[in-house]
Curated annotation (Swiss-Prot):
CDD domains: cupin_PpnP-like
Broad class of enzyme this protein falls into: transferase
Function, as annotated: Catalyzes the phosphorolysis of diverse nucleosides, yielding D-ribose 1-phosphate and the respective free bases. Can use uridine, adenosine, guanosine, cytidine, thymidine, inosine and xanthosine as substrates. Also catalyzes the reverse reactions.
Gene3D superfamilies per record: Jelly Rolls (2.60.120.10)
Catalytic activity: a purine D-ribonucleoside + phosphate = a purine nucleobase + alpha-D-ribose 1-phosphate; adenosine + phosphate = alpha-D-ribose 1-phosphate + adenine; cytidine + phosphate = cytosine + alpha-D-ribose 1-phosphate; guanosine + phosphate = alpha-D-ribose 1-phosphate + guanine
UniProt family annotation: Belongs to the nucleoside phosphorylase PpnP family.
EC number(s) reported in the record: 2.4.2.1, 2.4.2.2
Molecular functions per Gene Ontology: guanosine phosphorylase activity; purine-nucleoside phosphorylase activity; thymidine phosphorylase activity; uridine phosphorylase activity
GO cellular component terms listed in the entry, alphabetical order: cytosol
InterPro entries for this protein: Ppnp, RmlC-like_jellyroll, RmlC_Cupin_sf
Record-given protein name: Pyrimidine/purine nucleoside phosphorylase
Amino acid sequence: MKQFENVNVELEGNSYFDGAVTSRTVNFPDGSRKTLGFMLPGEYEFGTAAAELMEITSGELDVKLPGSDEWLSIKGGESFNVPADSKFQVKVKRVTDYCCSYL
């Protein structure tokens, strides 16, 4: 199991889509941050400010990345990248845990 050490976790969570997607921000000593969260089954669209690496730790979803009309299947243990200043769509098939790194 992967774990982070010497970090600060923000107590207040981030909640989207009436609580169907939630996360907590993890701040690292070097100033970087990640969010750890989960998504309930459903369809969602997200916007990015910074580029992101989305690591799916468990669950299953389909993602449609910016500039593509193709849906990609992603399962626990897989990841995908999203460019800055863009939008992407997901269809979550079952409860999905994720780690989002801001690049």
